[in-house]
Amino acid sequence: MKNLTPDELYKIIGQNVAKYRKEKGLSQLDLSLAMGYKSVSVVSGAEIYYNGKHFNIEHLLKISQILNIEISEFLKP
């Protein structure tokens, strides 16, 4: 993997979360509710890295458990 900036890595992670979420047939709202949020703002913003919003390690751990995938899958370009 080339040297990535944090911004590039956050974008890759967001794209991968969106990809795996869609593969599992979940909407942003479904994922948000499963993570314990009442709205899609965290998921929708972080998936597209809107205004610097990104997933933190706790988010990624929860998402990997919900989607039943390895957390490392989110880091693959």
Q: Each predicted region: which residue ranges?
A:
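Residues within the helices of the helix-turn-helix
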Residues: 18, 29, 61
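Short, basic-rich loop-to-helix N-cap that marks the start of a DNA-contacting helix
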Residues: 49-65
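Short C-terminal boundary/hinge segments that cap the last helix of small helical domains
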Residues: 57, 68-77
